[in-house]
Amino acid sequence: MIQAIVTDIEGTTTDIRFVHQVLFPYARERLTPFLRAHQQDDDIAALLVDLRREIAQPDADIETLITVLHGFMDEDRKSTVLKAIQGIIWRTGYLQADFRGHVYPEVAQQLADWHQQGLKLYVYSSGSVAAQKLLFGYSDAGDLCPLFSGYFDTHVGAKRDVSAYQKIANQLGIAPQALLFLSDIRQELDAAQLAGWHTCQLIRDLPDNDSAHPQVNRFDQIVLSLFTE
């Protein structure tokens, strides 16, 4: 019996185009002036120390770090530091109503239904926890944060690593066979399945013919009774 559902964001609850055509360009355009202006702020300074450690350049100056971060964005690298800085920049965008967090039309209602049924809901995304809370807190369906019991990002590991799902299960104190992971990416679902989780693949376009996971097009097509131990 499923006790908790953990969902991905990009391509799952949210159109990938919102992330790549709205969020990423917004942060890219503002990254350089933001870091030059705020490099001495405590939270930013700490992140830059982490970045220097990540690239093994303890004496790198701010211009070098800016270049590195732009390179990370070009590669779509899942750098914890980059994701944290992007999240801080996006916060301004949400607060100024420059954009709203996109969720697919059926997602909010289905999450609310599961929550009302007593299921625990969590998010696991490569975006920082702060960015996750912003997207759902300022979504085009309103504030969805009260529906979630917790959030996970790359601090628990990469989404294609089995160990990340083992850590999440341990932190939640829930047996893997009582957990359901929702994602659009087959390789992430493979990792969750190897950790003992149930899985369901969200396919908003063409079916993934190489996937062995159950596939649905919408959240309201997910039938929890089909996921049994």
Swiss-Prot record:
GO terms (BP aspect): L-methionine salvage from methylthioadenosine
Gene name of the encoded protein: mtnC
Cofactors (names): Mg(2+)
One Pfam family in the UniProt entry: Hydrolase
EC top class, as a word: hydrolase
Gene3D superfamilies recorded: 1.10.720.60, HAD superfamily/HAD-like
Cofactor note: Binds 1 Mg(2+) ion per subunit.
Example GO molecular function: 2-hydroxy-3-keto-5-methylthiopentenyl-1-phosphate phosphatase activity
Catalytic activity: 5-methylsulfanyl-2,3-dioxopentyl phosphate + H2O = 1,2-dihydroxy-5-(methylsulfanyl)pent-1-en-3-one + phosphate
EC number in record: 3.1.3.77
HAMAP family per the UniProt record, alphabetical: Salvage_MtnC
Free-text function comment from the UniProt entry: Bifunctional enzyme that catalyzes the enolization of 2,3-diketo-5-methylthiopentyl-1-phosphate (DK-MTP-1-P) into the intermediate 2-hydroxy-3-keto-5-methylthiopentenyl-1-phosphate (HK-MTPenyl-1-P), which is then dephosphorylated to form the acireductone 1,2-dihydroxy-3-keto-5-methylthiopentene (DHK-MTPene).
Coiled coil: none
Pathway: Amino-acid biosynthesis; L-methionine biosynthesis via salvage pathway; L-methionine from S-methyl-5-thio-alpha-D-ribose 1-phosphate: step 3/6; Amino-acid biosynthesis; L-methionine biosynthesis via salvage pathway; L-methionine from S-methyl-5-thio-alpha-D-ribose 1-phosphate: step 4/6
Protein name, entry field: Enolase-phosphatase E1
Highest taxon above the source species: Bacteria
CDD domains cross-referenced by the UniProt entry: HAD_EP (cd01629)
Organism: Yersinia pestis (strain Pestoides F)
Subunit record text: Monomer.
Alphabetical UniProt keywords: Amino-acid biosynthesis, Hydrolase, Magnesium, Metal-binding, Methionine biosynthesis
Keyword Nucleus: no
Annotated family: Belongs to the HAD-like hydrolase superfamily. MasA/MtnC family.
